[in-house]
Amino acid sequence: VMMIYPEGILYCQVQPSDVPEIVEETLLKGRQIKRLAYEEPTQHKALPFYHDIPFYGKQVRIALRNCGLIDPESIDEYIAHDGYAALGKVLTSMTPEDVLREMKDSGLRGRGGAGFLTGLKWEFARRSQNFPKYAICNADEGDPGAFMDRSILEGDPHSLMEGMIIAGYAMGAGQGYVYCRAEYPLAIQRLKTAIAQAHEYGLLGENILESGFSFDLKVKEGAGAFVCGEETALMNSIEGKRGEPRPRPPFPAVAGLWNKPSNFNNVKSYAMTPQIILRGAAWFKAIGPEKSPGTAIFALTGKINNTGL
């Protein structure tokens, strides 16, 4: 499959021998090659643009909004697509309470399975008077055939980071950890590149955007144990202990990493956060079902017609 931007032309079953024709006809002359276009199975009509294909027609990209569109190793391209605009809004015109209210009003629920309200989790951590506090991203994607988190980490790491910085501001945390399985070397490399770029631009570290708020991020590589996808086992792993679940209560929002208040969200929840802040809770709530607004990402694998996200 080949996608050509900015036109959004989708070619299927592309072979190396087709490349010269694609360069000559589509890239240089702006012509579509109908024999490579997707064919609608009932009417056998060629649909060269991906947004005309019924499979994609109703999809709304929020967490995946930049994947495939920008260079994931370029902070400048992320900024050119409204990157870090939400963080700027938060640090210049919103209090932590404003952020918590917006997130709760949006109705965003955890995309990891439990479906707990994201804003409420942040509020629990905010209420705790114990310091320091930690914002943690669970990127230990261990389910067979699942590659939703990996696609975001590899394709748009700055969206995850921006969401985590906003979460840190809302809950009063100064340090964040991204726990990523070692089987995702490209994701880890791009995360580390993005962190270095954010430091260089003053978007991570001390006194971000001269706001008085400081926050930093570290990447922790997991050793591949499936159980470390459970948040308390994940905390033990970060602390250098055996990755075994802890009894609850106390819950992580009260006594989490190193027995300090900690907030856990998955990659998808953090990646959606900047768009919620930028566009507003009402915009997000208008998408999807009433009790669980927004979008969800599904990995489709196996013996089916359309594999992917």
Where are the regions a protein language model picked out?
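Feature of Fe-S/electron-transfer and energy-metabolism proteins
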Residues: V1-L309
